[in-house]
């Protein structure tokens, strides 16, 4: 099949359009579409195209990445233009800026790949998936990191056996498995190969799927016997109105009424639900929230910004109002966001970006980090490891807190991105974290996707996006550690890097 297509695919009139087409199809492999089976086919077709014209490997990989990331993250334009009011003259080129940077990583992967002089089966079937995974890992770490769009996320769905690798080695192991499946499909479908060479990748594919399925059925963590009801508040506050002074009282009143309508054990408000600095609020406001929750038998967590303890900055926090007493503001337990969004929550290049911030009239764009390991917040009978906004896109950073927690919780405000796919892509990342860490993940968001996710990554309840609502459901506390929690990503990634180096060393010695 592949050999018959090759003569058409390598023609310049088809090669570049096909490359763009395959890349543009990648968003359909992620949430909200969940066509997980499509990603290995796309990746395999992409690799086969590059095989046909290896001279253009680096430029082809860059174009593929640029197209894929632009179509996946089109919602950047929504945030810049539709919400922040930046004119298209600036919003359009800035929308391409992040994909243009991210595309450097696929290009780097194939630049390194071209350096290997190896038999095709090893170069395609082993080395390439390793290099792809390592460069994806680098993309998540370098310059604060941005791991959205890693091909492994396409498999985070109940139907994909490859999702079973998440609790074993995290999302990057799922990425490695997805890349392996894609290239082994190419090797298995090669009509010119001898039957023996075609049989090996078929066996490897079967073994890979079986291993993933088996891991998916394995319970690495266990319930601790505790059960709780949770209420996740979704205020549906328009981002263009959120920080206006005339909307502060209506917003506070809305959430106060929502808190009063639920008798759940644990009640969680979204990120920056209260659009005022905590220390600037009249103390009786928080006291009333705490009293309202206490009267209903609830523990209450609220997303709010607050000044740092030294008073020299501010931080994005979730405060635990359980047992709150008026006149004791300094004694409030809280979690403060540690992994900040560059250009959104702090200014990495203030001399360049300050004029843009003024044009967009962005509030609170210079947050401070909350610090390294922070204690889980005790709410009723659950120890909750909170993360805020896109922090749940970084699995390794959540491990330490998760070890001491029975429940994971994310507080977010995705109103910046309107009705785009951003909220669903973010939800899929939370599904991955639940699987990696073997615990329930609850998500309280302003506009969506508010949800309850099981330790297997299944969405067991979800609120209708872009509506004012309260999502209620049941969760269990979980304890124990997945294999991923014991080692993180770094150790096994160093192992496959060493394997790639060993392969190169062996074959170079054979040449000499």
Curated annotation (Swiss-Prot):
The organism's place on the tree of life at top rank: Bacteria
Transmembrane segments: 5-25, 56-76, 92-112, 118-138, 168-188, 195-215, 487-507
UniProt-annotated location(s): Cell inner membrane
EC number(s) given by UniProt: 2.3.1.269
Annotated organism of origin: Neisseria meningitidis serogroup B (strain ATCC BAA-335 / MC58)
Keywords, comma-separated and alphabetical: Acyltransferase, Cell inner membrane, Cell membrane, Membrane, Transferase, Transmembrane, Transmembrane helix
Transmembrane recorded as keyword: yes
Domain named CN hydrolase: residues: 233-477
InterPro entries per record: Apolipo_AcylTrfase (IPR004563), C-N_Hydrolase (IPR003010), C-N_Hydrolase_sf (IPR036526), LNT_N (IPR045378)
GO MF terms held by the record: N-acyltransferase activity
Protein name per Swiss-Prot or TrEMBL: Apolipoprotein N-acyltransferase
Homology family: Belongs to the CN hydrolase family. Apolipoprotein N-acyltransferase subfamily.
Coiled coil location: none
GO biological process: lipoprotein biosynthetic process
UniProt GO cellular component terms: plasma membrane
Predominant subcellular localization, coarse grouping: membrane
Catalytic residues (UniProt): 271 (proton acceptor), 337, 389 (nucleophile)
Known pathway: Protein modification; lipoprotein biosynthesis (N-acyl transfer)
Membrane topology: Multi-pass membrane protein
Function: Catalyzes the phospholipid dependent N-acylation of the N-terminal cysteine of apolipoprotein, the last step in lipoprotein maturation.
């Amino acid at each position: 099949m592949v050999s018959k297509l090759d003569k058409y695919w390598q023609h310049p009139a088809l090669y570049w359009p096909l490359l763009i087409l395959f890349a543009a199809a990648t968003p359909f492999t992620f949430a909200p579409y969940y066509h997980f089976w499509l990603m290995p086919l796309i990746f395999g077709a992409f690799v086969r195209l590059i095989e046909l014209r290896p001279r253009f490997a680096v430029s082809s990989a860059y174009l593929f990445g640029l197209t894929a990331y632009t179509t996946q993250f089109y919602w950047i334009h929504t945030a810049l233009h539709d919400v922040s009011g930046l004119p298209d003259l600036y919003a359009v080129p800035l929308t391409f800026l992040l994909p243009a940077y991210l595309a450097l990583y696929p290009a780097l992967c194939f630049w390194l790949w071209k350096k290997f002089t190896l038999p095709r089966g090893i170069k395609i079937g082993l080395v390439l998936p390793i290099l792809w995974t390592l460069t994806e890992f680098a993309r998540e770490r370098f310059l604060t990191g941005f791991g959205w769009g890693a091909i492994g996320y396409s498999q985070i769905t109940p139907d994909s056996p490859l999702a079973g690798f998440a609790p074993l080695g995290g999302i990057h192991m799922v990425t490695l498995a997805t890349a392996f499946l894609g290239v082994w499909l190419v090797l298995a479908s090669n009509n010119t190969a001898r039957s023996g060479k075609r049989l090996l990748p078929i066996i490897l594919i079967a073994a890979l799927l079986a291993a993933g399925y088996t891991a998916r059925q394995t319970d690495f963590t266990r319930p601790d016997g505790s059960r709780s009801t949770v209420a996740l508040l979704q205020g549906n506050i328009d981002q263009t109105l959120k920080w206006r002074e005339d909307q502060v009282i209506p917003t506070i009143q809305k959430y106060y009424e929502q808190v009063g309508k639920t008798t759940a054990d644990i009640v969680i408000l979204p990120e920056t639900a209260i659009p005022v600095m905590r220390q600037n609020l009249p103390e009786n406001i928080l006291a009333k929230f705490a009293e309202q929750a206490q009267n209903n038998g609830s523990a209450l967590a609220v997303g709010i910004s607050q000044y740092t303890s030294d008073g020299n900055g501010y931080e994005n926090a979730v405060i635990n109002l359980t047992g709150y007493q008026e006149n004791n503001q300094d004694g409030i337990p809280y979690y403060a966001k540690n992994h900040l969004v560059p250009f959104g929550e702090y200014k990495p290049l203030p001399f360049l970006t300050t004029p843009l911030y003024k044009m967009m009239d962005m509030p609170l764009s210079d947050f401070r980090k909350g610090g390294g390991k922070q204690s889980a917040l005790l709410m009723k009978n659950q120890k909750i490891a909170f993360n805020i906004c896109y922090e749940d896109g970084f699995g390794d950073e959540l491990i330490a807190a998760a070890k001491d927690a029975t429940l994971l919780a994310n507080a977010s405000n995705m109103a910046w991105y309107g009705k785009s796919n951003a909220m669903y892509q973010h939800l899929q990342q939370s599904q991955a974290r639940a699987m990696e860490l073997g615990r329930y993940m609850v998500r309280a968001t302003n506009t969506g996707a508010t949800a309850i996710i099981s330790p297997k990554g299944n969405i067991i309840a979800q609120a209708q996006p872009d509506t004012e609502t309260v999502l209620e459901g049941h969760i269990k506390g979980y304890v124990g550690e997945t294999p991923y929690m014991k080692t993180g990503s770094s150790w096994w990634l160093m192992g496959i890097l060493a394997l790639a180096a060993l392969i190169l060393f062996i074959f170079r010695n054979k040449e000499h």
